[in-house]
Structure formats: structure tokens, C-alpha cells
A protein has these predicted regions:
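Active-site nucleotide/adenylate-binding loops and adjacent lid/helix of ATP-dependent enzymes
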Residues: 102-173
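Conserved beta-strand positions in the Rossmann-like core of class I SAM-dependent methyltransferases
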Residues: 29-31
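Surface-exposed amphipathic alpha-helices with a cationic face
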Residues: 14-25, 67, 87-90
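N-terminal Rossmann NAD(P)H-binding glycine-rich loop of SDR-like oxidoreductase domains
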Residues: 10
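Residues in the short beta-alpha loop(s) of Rossmann-like NAD(P)-binding domains
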Residues: 34-36
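Conserved N-proximal alpha/beta basic substrate-recognition cap immediately N-terminal to
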Residues: 42-127, 136
Length: 173
């Protein structure tokens, strides 16, 4: 049986990833971590481990211990913040499918540009410099609806599908 570690397993991305694994024909032993003890109750994992945040000095030692103690075959770090930290560790290269850390970014626009430059299909993206630019951006991108997103954050934080530039303006303000 393959053993998988899903970090950030209590967030919506982690929960959905675990659900996808459970829906497959294959049986997996899944260890889930999350820094939020309450979110850790959401995913259908076999083992739950409350972890410190990715920025805590104890995060990496704990991940290494989990990998060793549970004979983990594959690590799926769910939030981008944890993926970035784990991608920098050479001992985990064979246990993840993460790209080089230079491709990962906390900035969604940088990620979009890196993906585009590496021939991955991505949506057209514009950076808003001023609220007064909203109508022209909507026109340039086909009139809407458009996703309005913050450049940083996970889990769809500060994102909304807006039908008009007026709706986007109200969302931003």
C-alpha cells in the first residue's frame, strides 16, 4: 500500500485532494497534517498530525520525522506556502512532484508568468494599477465575467468572479 503525506490537509485543496485519492481504485494510507487542529478534522485521512506553520523552525523537522516514521512514499504539500518550503529540500525531491523552487512563487502573477513562459496554458491576466483602469481591462479581456484576485494568498482568498467593472470596483474597495 502506498503511503502519502498531505500537508495542509484540512484546507479545501487538501480535503479535495484526499477525496480524489479515496475515490480512486487504489487504497492509500494517508497521513494528514495541518496547523489548525479544527481543520485537521475535515479530511478523510488515516492519521492526523497537528503541525506548526510552515514558517516555524519545527515544521521541517516534523515533516522529516513523519516521512521516516510512516515510511512515506509521496508528499503532497497542499498550500503553496508549504510547497515552497518543501521544494527547497533536496532530500524530498524523489518524494514530490514539485517544480524547482524558482518556478514556485507566493505571488500569483509571478506564477502565471512562469507557467506561461514554460508553455503551460494559463488564463489571460492583467495587473490593476488603478481602479480607473477597470473598465478598459474588462473591455480588453472580453467584457466579463472576470476573476478578480489578490496577488498573494491561498484558498481563493480575496477572489470573486465579477460580471462588471462596477462590481469589481465595489469588491476591491
Amino acid at each position: 500500500m502506498k503511503k502519502i503525506l498531505v500537508t495542509g490537509s484540512g484546507g479545501i485543496g487538501g480535503v479535495n485532494f484526499v477525496r480524489a485519492l479515496r475515490a480512486s481504485e487504489e487504497n492509500f494510507s494517508i497521513v494528514g497534517t495541518d496547523f489548525n487542529q479544527y481543520y485537521l478534522q475535515f479530511p478523510d485521512v488515516d492519521t492526523r498530525i497537528n503541525s506548526p506553520r510552515h514558517s516555524d523552525s519545527e515544521f521541517i523537522p516534523l515533516i522529516k520525522k513523519i516521512v521516516s516514521d510512516h515510511s512515506i512514499n509521496f508528499i503532497h504539500p497542499q498550500p503553496s506556502s508549504e510547497a515552497l518550503v518543501i521544494s527547497k529540500l533536496p532530500e524530498f525531491k524523489s518524494k514530490t512532484l514539485l517544480p524547482d523552487p524558482t518556478i514556485l512563487s507566493h505571488d500569483k502573477l509571478t506564477t502565471q508568468k512562469n507557467l506561461s513562459e514554460n508553455n503551460f496554458p494559463v488564463s489571460s491576466t492583467k495587473t490593476l494599477s488603478s481602479i480607473s483602469d477597470l473598465p478598459s481591462i474588462f473591455d480588453t479581456l472580453g467584457g466579463g465575467p472576470l476573476w478578480i484576485r489578490a496577488k498573494k494568498g491561498a484558498g481563493g482568498n480575496l477572489s470573486l468572479l465579477c460580471k462588471t467593472s462596477d462590481e469589481a470596483q465595489h469588491w476591491i474597495e
